[in-house]
A protein has these predicted regions:
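Conserved C-terminal helix/tail region of periplasmic/extracytoplasmic solute-binding proteins
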Residues: 312-342
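A bilobed periplasmic-binding-protein/Venus flytrap-type ligand-binding module shared by bacterial periplasmic
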Residues: 130-137, 172-174, 248-263, 268, ...
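Periplasmic-binding protein-like
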Residues: 127, 187-192, 231-256, 301
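Mature extracytoplasmic/periplasmic domains
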Residues: 255-315
Length: 342
């Protein structure tokens, strides 16, 4: 009897570290607000229900979270990071991401080619920056990027100043260039300046400018435009007939040195599943990266929603991630000096 009790107690003590490890949370780094709330509700809760592993969040801005990751290199405070595709390149160049074993992410076989951003990070959803306007305040129809330069739109447009990649690339494309030869669009951008009434640096500012009518035309994130429509603001998203919308793909990566890599693989695989992708589309109004996701009829064919290879190719322009990551500081500096300043 004594031997049995001793053996049982020994086994129990040996099992404690394993149980403790099983209870350790998976830490996910993500933006705040609706992004975090949606990931928690749509992904984290089902993940915990399925695996028994709790999920905690690091919340912050894109660059702030990158800075924290750099400080914690080799002993990361988080396990999975959501960030933009081009900033993901900075994580990679700094050695902050683990190169994943794709056999551990079976749902990755179903995602669009465009969502495989590198051997280190995978797309989670897509959206576009396009022209959005209020037909009740702008009587003429806007159908092209080129319409932004019309004299009739003087003092009516808002654009982002924190990341001018979108309008810089469009201006370059209009002059026969691209993001790599962006200087070709400099003069055209200067010509746009009289039409710009405001700049924004947050989603909230962007939406407020449109709601109040201060800027009834914007280069806007499609997600924000759909949100305004849900609030009853009559905005129209333009499918430009001259150049596509500028695609954004948010991505996921596993932090190098994560002690919860196995759980991280399961989390990422769940995000890419058809069921979760369908819920993300419904909740965030983003485009799925898994073409098998269910998309509401009202969103099919709309800006930022790509379901086939042809739609990815024809209705979206993807800026080269490495060029964007490298050039963004220079673009921001030029844009501030030449467009933002009076």
């Amino acid at each position: 009897m004594f031997l049995r009790v001793t053996t049982f107690l020994t086994a129990l003590l040996l099992a404690l570290p394993l149980a403790a490890r099983a209870a350790e949370p998976l830490v996910v780094s993500v933006w705040g607000g609706n992004w975090k709330d949606t990931i928690e509700r749509v992904v984290a809760k089902p993940f915990t229900a399925k695996t028994g592993i709790p999920v905690e969040f690091e919340v912050g801005g894109t660059i702030d979270r990158l800075a924290k990751a750099r400080v914690a290199k080799g002993n990361p405070l988080v396990d999975v990071t959501f960030t933009t595709s081009h900033v993901g390149r900075l994580y990679i160049s700094d050695g902050l991401y683990e190169r994943p074993d794709m056999t551990k992410i079976p749902n990755a076989k179903e995602i669009a080619r465009e969502a495989i951003r590198s051997p280190y990070h995978l797309g989670s959803w897509a959206y576009v920056y396009i022209v959005v306007y209020r037909p009740d305040l702008v009587k003429e129809e806007i159908t092209r990027w080129a319409d932004l330069w019309k004299p009739s739109l003087r003092g009516k447009i808002a654009v982002p100043d924190f990341d001018p990649s979108h309008i810089i690339t469009i201006a370059a494309l209009m002059e026969g260039g691209n993001e790599s030869t962006w200087q070709k669009g400099e003069d055209r951008l200067r010509q746009l300046k009289p039409n710009i009434v405001a700049f924004y640096s947050t989603d909230a500012q962007s939406q407020d400018l449109m709601k109040t009518g201060q800027a009834p035309v914007e280069v806007m994130l499609s997600v924000n435009a759909y949100h305004l429509q849900e609030q009853g603001v009559a905005v129209k998203l333009v499918q430009p007939t001259d150049y596509p919308g500028i695609v954004g793909i948010d991505t996921m990566g596993i932090m190098a040195g994560s002690k919860r890599a196995d759980a991280a693989y399961q989390f990422i695989d769940l995000v890419l599943s058809r069921e979760i992708q369908s819920q993300l589309v419904e909740s965030l109004k983003v485009g799925p990266v898994n073409g098998g996701a269910t998309v509401p009829a009202k969103l099919r064919g709309q800006p930022g929603i790509f379901l086939t290879p042809a739609e990815w190719k024809e209705r979206g322009y993807i800026i080269d991630d490495e060029v964007r990551a490298k050039m963004l500081p220079a673009w921001r500096e030029w844009f501030t000096a030449n467009i933002v300043k009076k």
